[in-house]
Swiss-Prot record:
GO terms for cellular component: ribonucleoprotein complex; ribosome. It comes from Prochlorococcus marinus (strain SARG / CCMP1375 / SS120). GO terms for molecular function: rRNA binding; structural constituent of ribosome. This is Large ribosomal subunit protein bL20. The lineage of its organism: Bacteria, Bacillati, Cyanobacteriota, Cyanophyceae, Synechococcales. SUPFAM superfamilies: Ribosomal protein L20. The keyword RNA-binding applies. Belongs to the bacterial ribosomal protein bL20 family.
Amino acid sequence: MSRVKRGNVARKRRNKILRLAKGFQGSNGSLFRTANQRVMKALCNAYRDRKRRKRDFRRLWIARINAAARMNGMSYSKLIGNLKKADIRINRKMLAQIAILDPTNFQKVVADVKK
């Protein structure tokens, strides 16, 4: 059986992990074993939090819309239900932006929906 030398491949694999771990504190950024563990955990967290970010922003938009709607005498659920009945297609992100940046137009939207 012939001998297999993996020096180049192994070094590249380790250096790839160490490049990903650049900036980590202490041995987590310089020793391969600990860096590998930290990088794996960081990638898992990044994957999880990319999914979580979508949920978090939706919750934030709903909270903002609810606060603005209640200032105009309507609950969030009634506002969204009436928007659907009136066939007004504004998504929650846009509604939250309107509520914060342009309260007068948000009042008009609520007034249109109340009819």
